[in-house]
Amino acid sequence: MVTERQQDILNLIIDIFTKTHEPVGSKALQESINSSSATIRNDMAELEKQGLLEKAHTSSGRMPSVAGFQYYVKHSLDFDRLAENEVYEIVKAFDQEFFKLEDILQEAANLLTDLSGCTVVALDVEPSRQRLTAFDIVVLGQHTALAVFTLDESRTVTSQFLIPRNFLQEDLLKLKSIIQERFLGHTVLDIHYKIRTEIPQIIQRYFTTTDNVIDLFEHIFKEMFNENIVMAGKVHLLNFANLAAYQFFDQPQKVALEIREGLREDQMQNVRVADGQESCLADLAVISSKFLIPYRGVGILAIIGPVNLDYQQLINQVNVVNRVLTMKLTDFYRYLSSNHYEVH
């Protein structure tokens, strides 16, 4: 059982330690804690007994343990605060013209990695929730073509493929017609289901030779099922993570899955501190926060760093970036949905 004073002491030690990265002694706490040095030392000893503090090898001071950081995140972290002193710089960073969604997400990731010194990941709306709004096939050469998908009237995904040997020009038109008739307006999740259930029967009806046609469907749609992910500051992992964690970030789809699994459907923000699960990120801290992508859904910003982060400062910064990012995205999608020649 942690008393109110002990919690204040733990919070103050974490605040000092995350700024100085030096063990904290009782004298450093006396100005802020209205108690004698002896009382503070007793409380620090009790916090150590509970596993929330640990001794430093090189001094008589104490440092927060992993359990101490976990306790702080659960009981003391304020998720609603804003880094007001940094609002101007964050707004200024977004004061430029962007030509696609990925550029806006990349700017947010770059900004957060510069502020935090950590690795940052930004995720678009979950692929399964995106909707196919346009489709076309562009013939590139005698044997190659390009499938062009538009998701949510804003994101373009392309997939180059070899035209099957037995395909005629009219077969490509059939393929295009089937996709437009059966899939337009449906979510990616619905399309994935239809490819498994409806499409095999439709292929039998429309194609004389069905060899490789279902494989072609799966090939051209494969890219659409992948996460739209941007990263910044991967090199920072070398400062605080092991080689396995660094190499894990060479697999962006697995990184995206790990981040999504750490944030429940009903959560807007979450902080995981060395949660001990079987994961390459198990010994690290992951701060995840959802942000609104107008007209489409929500994306996720995630900061990956060492356990001894200044969590409150990072949450404040993430909150500001989220708000400015949402404003920028609102302008971006409002422009996309407007008549181009009426915009001044």
From Swiss-Prot:
Pfam families: HrcA, HrcA_DNA-bdg. Belongs to the HrcA family. This is Heat-inducible transcription repressor HrcA. SUPFAM superfamilies: GAF domain-like, Winged helix' DNA-binding domain. Negative regulator of class I heat shock genes (grpE-dnaK-dnaJ and groELS operons). Prevents heat-shock induction of these operons. GO terms for molecular function: DNA binding. Keywords: Repressor, Stress response, Transcription, Transcription regulation. The keyword Zinc-finger does not apply. One of its GO terms (biological process) is negative regulation of DNA-templated transcription. The keyword Amino-acid biosynthesis does not apply. Transmembrane segments: none annotated. It comes from Streptococcus pneumoniae serotype 4 (strain ATCC BAA-334 / TIGR4).
